[in-house]
Amino acid sequence: MARSRLPATSLRKPWKLDRQKLPSPDSGHSLLCGWSPGGKARPAGNTGAWAPAEQFFPASNRTREGGGLWPPLPLQSSPAAPTMLDSSAAEQVTRLTLKLLGQKLEQERQNVEGGPEGLHLEPGNEDRPDDALQTALKRRRDLLQRLREQHLLDELSRAQAWSGPSRGALGSALPPELPPTGILPTASPSPLAPDPPRIILPTVPQPPATIIQQLPQQPLIAQIPPPQAFPTQRSGSIKEDMVELLLLQNAQVHQLVLQNWMLKALPPALQDPPHVPPRVPRAARPRLPAVHHHHHHHHAVWPPGAATVLQPAPSLWTPGPP
């Protein structure tokens, strides 16, 4: 314990502090200073404590013009530190400014949509660059709209060209395609709104086109039986049958009248022998009209004198040659 106390007392002795007043050359007032272990006086500074500056900085850095030691030594001892800080800060500021400028340029390009037209127009119209940019943007938008309209019209025309041959030459399928063609010129001034329905129209009527192809086949089948019905009506019509029967009767009566005239024209010597043979065919011939009409029986029964009464009849009938 004695040994440990001795060095403590020995260390305390050189660190004795004696306040001493030293005049400062810059200011007429005195400064408080203390004693270091080496016995040399050091300025106390603002806090009144000494600072070992000789170990890190030479005396030339601590002194100033006039021999004064104010401001404190730690600030004067490192003259290179502020220069490094200033250079790094300047670099950071320049980098930030460059970034800001780049962002502004990007925003301007985005507003202009990356088009070189506005850049070319700016030097020509240096007095009003904003107007030139706006006009250029409007022109570009108009051109884009026109191009889109042309593309849409081309697509629609192609779709119609493909849909036409696929559907065939059916008249029922063509009318649904005609209305969209009439709508196209009316909708050309405002293409953006009605364009999507235009593209949908050719796709929607395709399934009904198959149904339309089946529908006309049914009427064709329905039209086939009517021509078959007409001949059935003709075959079973009563009027036509009556007309045919009347014509046949007229022809037969005409033949009978002619035969009677021929017999009368013959001389009397020849009339006696031939009277017997022709009477047999007369009785046989009327059998044919007997099936059609009952009037022919009377002709067969009539005597030869009755034939003379029938002579004026041909003038009334005046039928043509059979």
Swiss-Prot record:
InterPro entries: DUF4587, PRR29-like. This is Uncharacterized protein C21orf58. The gene is C21orf58. It comes from the Eukaryota. Residues 1-51, 107-130 are annotated as: Disordered. Residues 119-130 have a biased composition (Basic and acidic residues). PANTHER family: PTHR28604, RIKEN CDNA 2610028H24 GENE. Expressed in skin and fetal lung. Pfam families: DUF4587. It comes from Homo sapiens.
